[in-house]
């Protein structure tokens, strides 16, 4: 009989997947391994299983800032917002969460200005428009300091920038900035200790104080001694291929991270996706409705203060913890998690909502390490109405509130079951046991 908790089974069963990801991320960069970035040593699940979407429940908390649609068309390709696989009655209000322009993958270059980066020089952009960036340089920076209502589109067309201590792209002010790749390879890296801009800790290769959209049809490689991309407002990813290798958080935002499409590959010693606002615990959420994400993270793969809502996409996550937020809602998608602590952890991160782990659809595969680890850990309630949960773990569930199972398929250590056993092995990392219920 095979012991499903044997360490070798958990951590070596998909070794080739890990090797492929690590190679894909590191080989994409023009900076060699001499920069000193660490690589972890676990594995991804394959997760090649079909699934049927289920209807989401209707409990809603409105934490999304409603934005007027961008009316200027700048593209020949891309989907529209009403074509996305979005749950309209989920945890997050998805109304206007993406504009049509967010989803456009190519820029209108008819009135674009072109700049070529050069060593130790700064390109300053102070007004709305489309700007094509080309060339290779060291210690160069693109600084956007435009008006509060200006939308700026930076079109990266075969750009390589290698810096010692300053962001390659620094958005000081604008309404929204689009970083769009052409059908080209673009590499941005910072190898040394970041230098602050006055009181602003500019700690990322791309650092934005305002809304940021990453999209396009090409490849963007980011390598950092700290964070990969930091946004102090809302960050959206709607297309392109993005490869990030960094020491700290790969994608970090204050208000939200929203992913509609694209191919994202991350190797980091901290969090792959991190949304947190120290001043407002009603924001700091992560929404995913498409694309692919492969993340190898030393801490959390996806971490949010308030809500993680997944409506679609394919996620392969290998981390200390897979998903961590106050309310985690999975409505669709294919999600594979290999974790050494809790794979899914609904903990007290926000005082505005109650910890809930909720499964309404999709196919979720979880493989846990041995020891005091939980596949699904909720400091509040556990809700299962649909989808498939395929768990290999000593402790499949640990919840402090109530459990409601009205549908879905549950597979525990290879056996389909309708029984949920509460392990009660203690609160998850960063959470508190017992306590607040409701809003």
What do these predicted ranges mean?
Residues 2-439:
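A composition-driven surface/loop motif
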């Amino acid at each position: 009989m095979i012991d499903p908790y044997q360490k070798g089974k958990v951590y070596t069963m998909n070794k080739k997947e890990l090797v492929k990801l690590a190679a894909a991320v590191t080989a994409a960069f023009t900076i060699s391994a001499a920069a000193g970035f660490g690589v972890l040593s676990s594995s991804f699940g394959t997760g090649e299983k079909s699934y049927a979407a289920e209807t989401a429940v209707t409990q809603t908390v409105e934490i999304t800032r409603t934005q007027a649609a961008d009316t200027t068309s700048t593209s020949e390709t891309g989907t529209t917002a009403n074509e996305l696989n979005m749950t309209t009655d989920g945890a997050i209000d998805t109304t206007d969460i993406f504009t049509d322009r967010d989803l456009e993958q190519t820029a209108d270059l008819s009135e674009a200005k072109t700049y070529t980066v050069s060593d130790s020089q700064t390109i300053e952009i102070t007004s709305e428009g489309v700007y094509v960036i080309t060339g290779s340089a060291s210690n160069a920076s693109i600084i956007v300091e435009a008006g509060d209502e200006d939308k700026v589109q930076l079109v990266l067309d075969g750009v390589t920038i290698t810096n010692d201590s300053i962001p390659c792209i620094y958005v000081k002010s604008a309404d929204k900035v689009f970083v769009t790749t052409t059908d080209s390879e673009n590499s941005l890296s910072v190898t040394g200790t970041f230098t602050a801009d006055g009181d602003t800790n500019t700690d990322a290769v791309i650092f934005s104080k305002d809304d940021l959209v990453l999209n396009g049809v090409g490849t963007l490689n980011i390598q950092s001694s700290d964070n990969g991309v930091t946004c102090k407002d809302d960050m959206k990813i709607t297309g392109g291929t993005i490869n990030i290798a960094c020491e700290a958080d790969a994608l970090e935002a204050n208000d939200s991270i929203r992913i509609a499409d694209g191919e994202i590959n991350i190797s980091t010693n901290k969090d792959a996706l991190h949304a947190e606002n120290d001043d407002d615990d009603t924001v700091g959420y992560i929404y995913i409705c498409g694309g692919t994400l492969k993340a190898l993270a030393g801490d959390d793969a996806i971490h949010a203060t308030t809500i993680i809502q997944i409506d679609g996409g394919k996620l392969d996550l290998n981390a200390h913890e897979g998903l961590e937020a106050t309310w985690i809602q999975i409505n669709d998608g294919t999600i594979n998690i290999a974790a050494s602590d809790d794979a899914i952890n609904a903990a007290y991160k926000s005082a505005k909502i109650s910890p809930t782990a909720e499964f309404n659809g999709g196919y979720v595969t979880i493989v846990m390490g041995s020891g005091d680890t939980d596949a699904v850990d909720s400091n509040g309630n556990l809700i299962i109405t649909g989808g498939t949960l395929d768990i290999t773990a000593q402790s499949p569930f640990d919840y402090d509130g109530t459990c409601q199972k009205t549908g879905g398929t549950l597979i525990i250590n290879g056996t389909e079951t309708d029984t949920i056993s509460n392990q009660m092995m203690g609160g998850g990392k960063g959470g508190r046991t017992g306590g607040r219920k409701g809003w």
